Amino acid sequence: PTAGSDPTTLGLFASIGIVKGQPFNPDERMKKILTDAANIGAVTARAIAFKIRSKEAYFYPDSAWRLPFFGGYKFEVSPGVSNLDGAAFYYYFATGVTPAMEEKMVGRGSQYPWSVQDAKGNPFDGGKNYKLRLPPNVPVKDFWSVIVYDNQTRSMVQTDQKAPSVSSQNKGVKTNADGSVDVYFGPKAPMGMENNWVQTIPGKGWFMILRLYGPLEPWFNKTWRPGEIVLQP
């Protein structure tokens, strides 16, 4: 229904032949324009998602940890002004959004820091091995998990593992003497660390999300922060 949108958006649709109650029959010229536009749009969103330049898109200075909501869950530069890069990135990268996924709600809601680059700024390579150290006392009321995604499909990577993740809910996850937890990524698990490992696929890129459920104050005030993901020899 026309009442479900605004005049500017409906005008943009009309300019390419999408009008309520009328058939959509683009000619060959318009089909090429629309195909090119879709490809350019996908490439642009991909570049914004995986190699954004704005420092405001990162949790910490000189870090690869990214904000999932660039411009808040409303994707705004300021009240009423859209953050177009933030929206393009997020809706290429994910689907739904609620305030509880972004706002400070100590002990409730969730947070989703994520990364697509190692400590030196290089993209993750499914044929190489990496390590993430989570310092002691991960600040969550409920649980945490590390999940790996295919950067082509943006869905969970499909491997021999039942789930491409390591979680505080999993049995057998090893903890270091100081209480920290090491999570490994790569085609094969380090010896004895199978329960702390997420399998990746040679020839495929990937990204990961650190999911924090019921995040606590040390997360929000940044007195606790995850280590950078380091390429292993």
Question: Which residue stretches match the model-derived regions?
Answer:
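A compositional/structural signature for long, glycine/proline-rich flexible linkers
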Residues: 1-233
